[in-house]
UniProtKB/Swiss-Prot annotation:
Domain of life: Viruses
Domain notes: Late-budding domains (L domains) are short sequence motifs essential for viral particle budding. They recruit proteins of the host ESCRT machinery (Endosomal Sorting Complex Required for Transport) or ESCRT-associated proteins. Contains one L domain: a PPXY motif which is involved in the interaction with Itch, a member of the Nedd4 family.
Motif (PPXY motif): 7-10
Species this chain originates from: Human herpesvirus 7 (strain JI)
Name the UniProt record assigns to this protein: U24 protein
GO cellular component term, pick one: membrane
Gene name for this UniProt entry: U24
Residue ranges crossing the lipid bilayer per the database entry: 52-72
Length: 82
C-alpha cells in the first residue's frame, strides 16, 4: 500500500512563490551602504520625471474630455436650423 502525496494546494504554491521571491530579493546586495550611495539628485530626477508623466497624462485627459463635451454640445444644440 503506497501513499501518494496529494498535489500542493494553491495557497501552498503561492506561499512558496512569495518565499522564493523574498529570498531572492534579500540575496541581492542591498546593504545600507549601497542604498545610501544613490544620490538624492537621482531620486529627485526620477520623482520629477514621474510627476511630469502623470501631469502630462492628466492634461491630455482633460483636453480630450473638453473636446468630447464640446462635440456633443455642438451636435445636440449647434446643428443647422432652417
Amino acid at each position: 500500500m503506497t501513499h501518494e502525496t496529494p498535489p500542493p494546494s494553491y495557497n501552498d504554491v503561492m506561499l512558496q512563490m512569495f518565499h522564493d521571491h523574498s529570498v531572492f530579493l534579500h540575496q541581492e546586495n542591498l546593504s545600507p551602504r549601497t542604498i545610501n550611495s544613490t544620490s538624492s539628485s537621482e531620486i529627485k530626477n526620477v520623482r520629477r520625471r514621474g510627476t511630469f508623466i502623470i501631469l502630462a497624462c492628466l492634461i491630455i485627459s482633460v483636453i480630450l474630455c473638453l473636446i468630447l463635451i464640446l462635440h456633443i454640445f455642438n451636435v445636440r444644440y449647434g446643428g443647422t436650423k432652417p
